Amino acid sequence: AADLIAQAEHDVYAQSILISDNKNLISSVNLSLEKQLKKLPKKKIATKSLKNFGIAILSNRNSITEIINIIAPEHLELYTKFNNKIIKGVKNAGSIFIGKYSPEAIGDYIAGPNHVLPTSGTARFSSGLSVNDFLKRHSIIKITKTGIERLSSSVINLAKHENLDGHAYSVKIRINKD
């Protein structure tokens, strides 16, 4: 419950979701949420966020990684007997926290992973900010005569399809196809 609140207190759009197949756990978390929210200075924000997202009952444990990858959470906390199995299937999450002694707040403030993470499902196509975002990269392309001859028809067809005749001609002229 505390970890759900830690996410929900950010704003009403914060995605704080508990997914479980254990109805007793869900009941216990709901009771704990009620108690903890009473003391929270940002109670209104957290309560609205939890109403927007909150708790999902999982009927098929095998679909958990599929659900995680669709949600693509900014923070994923795993508290199961099957953490290692689940992690192998997770492709879309900003940061992953494993076990009851690894709350997201530790990752935000002191454990070392970046706090700038993809939110609102954007972990499906991006990662957290890293040193790579501050590096300048470039591509070097060197094609041989044989290489351009092999690639020319594909490039020419694509260029024509995009109505970029200059692109097509820049390849044709190199292989003497006018």
Regions found by a protein language model. Give the residues of each.
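Short amphipathic alpha-helices in soluble, non-transmembrane regions
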Residues: 32, 67-70
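C-terminal core of ALDH-fold dehydrogenases
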Residues: 69-178
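Short acidic-hydrophobic, aromatic-tinged amphipathic segments that line or gate anion-handling sites
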Residues: 55-61
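Short phosphate-engaging motifs
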Residues: 25, 63, 86
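A conserved active-site cap/scaffold subdomain adjacent to cofactor or substrate pockets
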Residues: 1-51, 55
